[in-house]
Regions:
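Active-site-adjacent pocket scaffolds in enzyme catalytic domains
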Residues: 4-111
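Extended hydrophobic secondary-structure segments that form protein cores and membrane-embedded regions
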Residues: 1-4, 121-122
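C-terminal domain-boundary segment and adjacent tail
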Residues: 88-180
Length: 180
């Protein structure tokens, strides 16, 4: 399993991961383009919102490679909720009402899929006071944990099952093989 720092994966990264026999990458941020002061940018605006097996020469299209891209769950609210914001399934980047919107949107949009994935991301340092800009105090960490608890309870209420990225690869491979 691989996740590029600062979501900086590009076609070269994907080709290298395939060559090194990685099974899962989770570096893509749908609907986002990351600008760099150096002039180079990482553009994941074309990334699918749901997992797919990466095509080495066209990283936003499916292929029969063994590298599964599991993009972070980010929705473009301008298309669905009429306000200009990218909503992340990530603590400190969204509130519980936005998480509900994300879940409802993904479940509705992908209801015909064999499986649906919601991919939440956070750094372990965010659970340590003053180790992250998002949690500067124990009170911040406590609020963070309360938020995570609300998300997990909401997921449970919505019958969402938890899985590791490796387990998602196994599920995706099973459906890919069954549909050949």
């Amino acid at each position: 399993v691989f996740r590029s720092g600062r979501y900086a994966a590009n076609a070269n990264t994907i080709r290298s991961l395939i060559k090194l026999n990685y099974k899962v990458d989770s570096s893509f941020t749908p609907h986002l383009k990351w600008e760099s002061p150096l002039g180079n940018s990482i553009d994941h605006q074309r990334s699918p919102e749901q997992p797919y097996f990466c095509k080495p020469d066209d990283i936003y299209n499916s292929s029969d490679s063994n590298l599964l891209e599991v993009p972070l769950t980010i929705i473009d609210s301008t298309k669905y909720f009429f306000f200009n914001k990218k909503i992340w399934l990530r603590p400190k980047f969204s509130n519980i009402n936005e998480v509900k919107k994300i879940i409802n949107y993904v479940k509705s949009k992908y209801s015909n899929n064999d499986y649906i994935v919601l991919n939440m991301m956070f750094h372990s340092q965010e659970l340590i006071p003053n180790a992250s800009p998002y949690t500067k105090s124990q009170s911040d960490v406590d609020s963070y944990i309360i938020f995570l608890d609300k998300v997990f309870k909401l997921a449970q209420k919505e019958n969402i099952q938890f899985a590791t990225l490796e387990e998602i690869h196994n599920i995706a491979s099973q459906f890919l093989n069954n549909n050949k």
